[in-house]
């Protein structure tokens, strides 16, 4: 069995961010799954500039050598090498973070024909409104969405001291998400 390069994107970059427990939970469980080679992307560390290329990434036709910025070129290559994507996102003002939207905007065709799943966290809505907007954005980028997302409402109270969710069924939901990412990628591989 071949392993899939699973890109996990943590969509927060602010100082004092608290969602690391959520991102670490996803990363840890993916790393324990023999089907995946994990590429964890912390957008604070990635530190992409604001997108300002002279042409759209979709006009580059998947040729990441057309990027003027070396950061954009490297990011496009990294995305191209992923077989699937899980986005871990907080919710800011009923939507995803600006740094996450910027990272998505930097790349065009390299996103295409990859499964994408969402794990969100926040207050009363648990990041669900951010995921709602991300669904519209990612379908436009050519990603194929896993139907079910995981939303952590009042996430600071949702994990124990070991970084595991208090509700055991949440781990099973994550496993089902992983299964669906693999299933969708296998369909793409057969079709391609």
What is each PLM-predicted segment?
Residues 41-53, 109-110, 141-161:
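Mobile beta-alpha loop/short-helix "lid" or hinge segments that flank ligand
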Residues 25-33, 106, 110, 137-140:
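Alpha-helical structural signal in soluble globular domains
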Residues 3-8, 115, 153-162:
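A short small-residue
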Residues 89-90, 115:
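Short, proline-centered helix/strand-breaking motifs
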Residues 93-94, 125:
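Glycine-rich nucleotide phosphate-binding loop and flanking beta-alpha elements
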Residues 97-113:
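Rossmann-fold NAD(P) dinucleotide-binding segment
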Residues 112-154, 168-172:
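Short, glycine-/small-residue-rich phosphate/pyrophosphate-handling segment
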Residues 1-89, 95-101, 164-183, 188-192:
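N-terminal beta1-alpha1-beta2 submodule of the flavodoxin-like/Rossmannoid cofactor-binding fold
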